[in-house]
Regions:
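C-terminal substrate-binding subdomain of Rossmann-fold SDR/epimerase-dehydratase oxidoreductases
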Residues: 48-155
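NAD(P)-dependent short-chain dehydrogenase/reductase
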Residues: 4-63, 68-77, 107-110
């Protein structure tokens, strides 16, 4: 897998790599249709179309949402870092460190909600521990999900 290759190239060729695991990226140009569309993109499209927001399962699954500009900043911080050699070849979580249920996210956008059957194998909880990336690269996310949603829907 890609993470093992990065670690191997760091060890064998002294190539400075870092491995980032991004948590539920969102932003202004996110997909709004298709299998890779995030829940925020789908909800905003449904709101714009006057449709009810569709929640899969009970809506209590929790997600750690990370703004795309915060993800870009994490990459920049790592690229310009003077971190110790021990930092390279390591895995870092890039997330907000806060998670929201899908129901909570939907409630930020609309009261018009419908539930559909759950998908098999869907993760119940994602939550990034961002201590390692903060301690190594002094990175923290800046964008608050609730503020971003309000801006998108004009509140």
């Amino acid at each position: 897998n890609g993470e093992k290759l990065c670690k191997m190239y760091t060890d064998l060729f002294d190539l400075d790599t870092v491995i980032f695991r991004y948590f539920n990226a969102y932003g202004e140009r996110q997909p709004i249709r298709g299998q890779y569309a995030p829940v925020l993109g789908i909800f905003l499209r449904q709101l714009a179309a006057g449709e009810p927001l569709t929640i899969v399962g009970d809506g209590e699954q929790r997600r750690d949402f990370t703004y795309v500009k915060d993800i870009v900043n994490a990459n920049i911080m790592a690229a310009i870092s003077n971190a110790d050699k021990d930092a390279y070849g390591q895995v870092y979580n890039v997330g907000s460190g806060v998670n929201y249920s899908v129901n909570e996210v939907a409630a930020m956008i609309s009261d018009d909600i419908k539930y559909i059957p759950p998908r098999l194998g869907e993760a119940r909880i994602s939550l990034a521990n961002v201590d390692k990336i903060y301690n190594t690269f002094a990175w923290r996310p800046l964008q608050n999900l609730e503020e971003w949603v309000k801006k998108q829907i004009g509140k």
